[in-house]
Amino acid sequence: VELTEAQRGAIVNLWGHLSPDEIGPQALARLLIVYPWTQRYFASFGNISSAAAIMGNPKVAAHGKVVVGALDKAVKNLNNIKGTYAALSTIHSEKLHVDPDNFRLLAESFTVSVAMKLGPSGFNAETQHALAKFLAEVVSALGKQYH
């Protein structure tokens, strides 16, 4: 997946309108609520037994910020996303044994969270297309060690 210069600009612009402290926790909470089987990777987070518990869980919020921090690295390295995520891919594959399809689910959850935050005027079809291509590259990079 190759981002055009216009799409790269759209990603950088989009990124400037997001707050990691807000969007990360929302996206991870959405993942855990919408796809409850993903909760098995977060047993150490304590109570994640309901939507309210997930939304109020400080460990979910903290890890959501970590996820957005990792995405920030990709935004800053748009020319080398695979290289940027090489070590993280190895950790998720060999140590954490995360099903790589969960990266796609998190990308979907992140996209919905961004769309809700920015609304139709801030998240138009062109921006969505750029974000989809960017996140597809991220998902591919995170799954690289599984192949």
Swiss-Prot record:
Keywords: Heme, Iron, Metal-binding, Oxygen transport, Transport. Red blood cells. Coiled coil: none annotated. It holds the Pfam family Globin. It comes from the Eukaryota. The keyword Oxidoreductase does not apply. One of its GO terms (cellular component) is blood microparticle. Residues 2-147 form the Globin domain. GO terms for biological process: hydrogen peroxide catabolic process. Heme b binds at residues 63, 92. GO terms for molecular function: haptoglobin binding; heme binding; metal ion binding; organic acid binding; oxygen binding; oxygen carrier activity; peroxidase activity. Heterotetramer of two alpha chains and two beta chains. Involved in oxygen transport from gills to the various peripheral tissues. Belongs to the globin family. This is Hemoglobin subunit beta.
